[in-house]
């Protein structure tokens, strides 16, 4: 799910940047340090939409760097248990398949794939095929899945997904 949140960060800047272009340089540094990162609390920071406040700087006695407190608004992507997402299949194995929904990596185990779909080891491309042959899941296919659980690391979020419910599975 996507959110538009107000966040804050302490930005450490070299004193040589404290000049007439301070706000521009601080904004550029904030973009490069924050966009595309993942925090366990908020999720993936997709993009910064605005910089609302840049505090007066405080000089760190130990290093000489200047610390600014920056308040900004950002678009955040945080997956939740039970959420339904569209994803692209990236890898298929006999244990299940991996898919990606934006920056989120999702694993769908064979236990969470409909029982009528079996792994086809004889195929040129590894895939899951339904017994009647009407449906096939292989690399680069688009699937609709439901998140069953998430695991948060320091810099990534992983999810377990399922296509065993109604209206889930291959799209198209």
From Swiss-Prot:
InterPro entries: NA-bd_OB-fold (IPR012340), RNA_pol_Rpb7-like_N_sf (IPR036898), Rpb7-like (IPR045113), Rpb7-like_N (IPR005576), S1_domain (IPR003029). Keywords: DNA-directed RNA polymerase, Nucleus, Transcription. CDD domains: RNAP_II_Rpb7_N, S1_RNAPII_Rpb7. GO terms for biological process: nuclear-transcribed mRNA catabolic process; positive regulation of nuclear-transcribed mRNA poly(A) tail shortening; positive regulation of translational initiation; transcription by RNA polymerase II; transcription initiation at RNA polymerase II promoter. Its main location: nucleus. The keyword rRNA-binding does not apply. It comes from the Eukaryota. Pfam families: S1, SHS2_Rpb7-N. Gene3D superfamilies: Nucleic acid-binding proteins, RNA polymerase Rpb7-like, N-terminal domain. GO terms for cellular component: P-body; RNA polymerase II, core complex; RNA polymerase II, holoenzyme. GO terms for molecular function: DNA-directed RNA polymerase activity; single-stranded DNA binding; single-stranded RNA binding; translation initiation factor binding. It is found in: Nucleus. Transmembrane segments: none annotated. DNA-dependent RNA polymerase catalyzes the transcription of DNA into RNA using the four ribonucleoside triphosphates as substrates. Component of RNA polymerase II which synthesizes mRNA precursors and many functional non-coding RNAs. Pol II is the central component of the basal RNA polymerase II transcription machinery. It is composed of mobile elements that move relative to each other. RPB7 is part of a subcomplex with RPB4 that binds to a pocket formed by RPB1, RPB2 and RPB6 at the base of the clamp element. Belongs to the eukaryotic RPB7/RPC8 RNA polymerase subunit family. Component of the RNA polymerase II (Pol II) complex consisting of 12 subunits. RPB4 and RPB7 form a subcomplex that protrudes from the 10-subunit Pol II core complex. This is DNA-directed RNA polymerase II subunit rpb7.
């Amino acid at each position: 799910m996507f959110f538009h949140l107000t966040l804050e960060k302490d930005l450490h800047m070299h004193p040589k940047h404290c000049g007439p272009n301070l706000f521009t340089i601080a904004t550029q540094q904030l973009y490069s340090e924050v966009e595309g990162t993942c925090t366990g609390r908020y999720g993936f920071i997709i993009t910064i939409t605005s910089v609302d406040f840049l505090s007066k700087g405080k000089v760190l006695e130990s290093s000489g760097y200047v610390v600014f407190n920056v308040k900004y608004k950002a678009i955040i992507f945080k997956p939740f248990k039970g959420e339904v997402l569209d994803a692209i299949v990236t890898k298929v194995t006999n244990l299940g398949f991996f898919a990606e929904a934006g920056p989120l990596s999702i694993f769908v185990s064979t236990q969470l794939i409909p029982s009528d779909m079996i792994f086809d080891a004889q195929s040129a491309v590894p895939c899951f095929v339904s017994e009647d042959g009407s449906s096939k899941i292989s690399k680069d296919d688009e699937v609709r899945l439901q998140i069953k659980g998430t695991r948060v690391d320091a810099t990534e979020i992983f999810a377990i997904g399922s296509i065993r419910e109604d209206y889930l599975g291959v799209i198209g």
